[in-house]
Every structure is written in structure tokens, then in C-alpha cells.
Regions:
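Function-dense linear segments that define catalytic or interfacial modules
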Residues: 197-242
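Long, basic N-terminal domains or extensions that often function
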Residues: 1-195, 199-204
């Protein structure tokens, strides 16, 4: 059963609808570092990552595989470092923030201060918080255009996982592309570009869309908007041709 107990050790409980089996016992505790080391190795091994990359560690000999090279490992209990190792790294309190908006390493003072220190460095560690920010901002920006954003669940999850500090920008494409079947345009924007298409109040596709970036642009997003407009123009031209 995976917990080193025999079937005869199981108890039965009946809630009136179903009978269930359960095991009750006491297990000897383990040192935090030992338990965390095992948990980390198990968690990494069982992550659902379809594609990994193999890279060399600093010794120039050892190779490991992960979705991207791991540069820092932070593990704290209160103010104390929990000694664990992973991907050739030893745990410490140093990490880094957003690669474009900060430059200096960050020393995490306390496990409880981690989230706020990372936010100060333009990284939002909590997945659920990033998703909530993205969804709320998409709705707000769409409403300002008297429109509604098409937000499929899988696309929301993907852009949430891709960004550290989500920022929403608006862009557009030539209205002539609206002659292409709406479903084709939406699929191209979502699948290839990770854009959120916009519909007007009557449900008609608009030639505007929203995109999730992780850059706080000094020009208010003008260059990002124009760059994405050029990219989507090529994509939609292909869709129109075929």
C-alpha cells in the first residue's frame, strides 16, 4: 500500500453510504533537512514536464535535466537556512528578482518575508495571485474598450506560468483580416501568439486584442504593441491565404 502496512492493519468505517478503509498509526519523525531533501527530489522527479533540457553543472562534467537551468536554491525555516542540495546547488538565502527590472542579488531575511521581498524585486511568486491579477486586468482593459476578452482556461494557465510580473497591453490588426472566419483568427491568436481576442457586446470579433507581457515599458507599451501587431499581421496573412 506504500505505507508499509498490511491489509490486516486497516480499519473499516461506514458513513452510511460507503464503506471505507483507513490506516491509523504513529511514525517516527525525521529531521527537517532530510525530509525536505526527499520531498524536493520526489517533487522534481514527478513534475509533469513534457520537454526538458540537459545542461552541464559548474564542474563542467556533471549533467542534469530540467525545464530550464536552475541558478539558485533558497530554503529557509524562519531565519535559518535548511541545508538541502538540488541540481548541483546548495541551499542558501540568496536569489534574484526580475531579470530586466532588478540587477542585484536578494538576500531573503526570513521565510515569512520571501513573498514581499520578491514583489519588491518585481516577481510575484504566487501562481494564484498572478492569475487573479491577469484575469482582473484583462477584464478591466476589455471593459475600457466596451468589449469582452475571450479567456480560455488553458490559455490563462499558460500565460500565468510564463510570467513573473504580468502587465497587460493592447494591440490591433488591420480590419481587413476580419473577413477570415472568426474561429480561424481566434485560434491563430491563442495558439500561436498567446493573445486574448476581443469581442464587442454583440459577440462579433474585434480587430483588437490583449497580450500579457512581463515588462513595465517606459513608453507605456507602445513598442510592445507595435511589435506584436507586426507579428500577428504575418500570422493572420497566412491564415487568410490558406
Amino acid at each position: 500500500l506504500g505505507i508499509n502496512c498490511a491489509v490486516t492493519d486497516l480499519e473499516r468505517v461506514d458513513d452510511g453510504k460507503n464503506e471505507q478503509l483507513y490506516y491509523e498509526g504513529v511514525r517516527q519523525g525525521v529531521e527537517l533537512a532530510s525530509g525536505l531533501q526527499h520531498a524536493l527530489e520526489y517533487a522534481v522527479k514527478h513534475l509533469p514536464i513534457p520537454k526538458v533540457m540537459t545542461y552541464q553543472l559548474a564542474d563542467g562534467v556533471t549533467t542534469v535535466s530540467f525545464v530550464r537551468p536552475v541558478r539558485h536554491l533558497t530554503a529557509l525555516l524562519g531565519t535559518e537556512i535548511v541545508p538541502v542540495e538540488l541540481f548541483g546547488l546548495k541551499s542558501g538565502r540568496l536569489t534574484r528578482g526580475h531579470r530586466f527590472h532588478t540587477s542585484e542579488p536578494i538576500a531573503i531575511e526570513n521565510a515569512d518575508s520571501y513573498v514581499e521581498q520578491m514583489k519588491a524585486a518585481f516577481v510575484m511568486p504566487c501562481y494564484d495571485e498572478r492569475r487573479a491579477v491577469i484575469e482582473a486586468e484583462l477584464k478591466r482593459r476589455a471593459a475600457a474598450l466596451d468589449a469582452e476578452a475571450i479567456m480560455p482556461e488553458d490559455l490563462l494557465e499558460e500565460v500565468t506560468a510564463l510570467t513573473e510580473w504580468p502587465v497587460i497591453y493592447e494591440s490591433q490588426f488591420e480590419s481587413e483580416f476580419l473577413a477570415v472566419p472568426q474561429e480561424c483568427l481566434i485560434l491563430t491568436m491563442q495558439l500561436n501568439q498567446k493573445y486574448f481576442a476581443l469581442e464587442d457586446r454583440s459577440g462579433k470579433l474585434m480587430n483588437r486584442f490583449l497580450l500579457v507581457s512581463q515588462l513595465i515599458a517606459k513608453d507605456g507599451g507602445k513598442a510592445i504593441s507595435e511589435g506584436n501587431a507586426r507579428v500577428v499581421r504575418a500570422r493572420l496573412a497566412d491564415a487568410k491565404f490558406f
